[in-house]
Design a protein with these regions (language model features):
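Compact, glycine-rich, soluble single-domain proteins
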Residues: 28-47, 61-65
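Hydrophobic residues on conserved beta-strands that form the core of alpha/beta folds
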Residues: 2-3, 64-67, 97, 111
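HotDog/MaoC-like acyl-thioester-processing domains
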Residues: 14, 77-83, 88-120
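Hydrophobic beta-strand-centered segment that forms part of the acyl-chain substrate-binding groove
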Residues: 46-83
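Short amphipathic alpha-helical segments enriched in hydrophobics
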Residues: 9, 23, 44-51
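Catalytic strand-loop segment that frames the active site of acyl-thioester-processing enzymes
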Residues: 1-32
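A residue-level detector for short acidic-glycine micro-motifs
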Residues: 4-7, 69, 74, 88-90, ...
Length: 120
C-alpha cells in the first residue's frame, strides 16, 4: 500500500502514498491506524523487494516479529500524501530492526520501531 518508492540506500528507504477514499483502510474521511501500520509494513516490503530485484535474487517473505513504541498523533485525511521513511537500525542474520517515521508535509504523524524476520 504505497504509491511510489522515492528513495533507497542501504540505510534509508522512503515511499509516498496518497490517501484515497476507496482505500480499504479509509473510514469517515481518514486513513485508520491499521492503515498507517500497513503502509509502514509495505514500505519495509518495498525495501526488501527493491534489494532483491536489484541483485537479481528472489524476493523473500518478511514477517513482522515486533512493533514497539508505536505512536500516532493523528490519522491522515483522504487526499493527504504520506511520506514514510524507514531507517535501518541494525541487521543481524535474517533479522532487521528499523525505525519508521510517517509524515504529512513536515508534520510527523506516526513513529514506531519494527523487528522483521526474513524467511528463506
Amino acid at each position: 500500500m504505497i504509491d511510489r518508492l522515492i528513495h533507497y540506500d542501504p540505510v534509508r528507504t522512503v515511499t509516498t502514498l496518497q490517501v484515497r477514499a476507496d482505500n480499504i483502510f479509509a473510514d469517515d474521511g481518514h486513513l485508520s491506524v491499521a492503515g498507517i501500520n500497513e503502509n509502514i509494513a509495505q514500505t519495509c516490503a518495498a525495501r526488501m523487494g527493491y534489494i532483491s530485484h536489484s541483485s537479481g535474487g528472489r524476493v523473500k517473505i518478511g514477517v513482522i516479529g515486533a512493533i514497539t513504541g508505536f505512536s500516532v498523533t493523528r490519522t491522515p485525511l483522504v487526499g493527504e500524501v504520506l511520506t514514510t521513511t524507514i531507517d535501518v537500525i541494525q541487521e543481524v542474520f535474517q533479522v532487521t530492526l528499523v525505525h519508521a517515521t510517517v509524515t504529512v508535509g513536515t508534520e510527523v504523524i506516526a513513529e514506531t520501531d519494527l523487528k522483521i524476520a526474513l524467511q528463506d
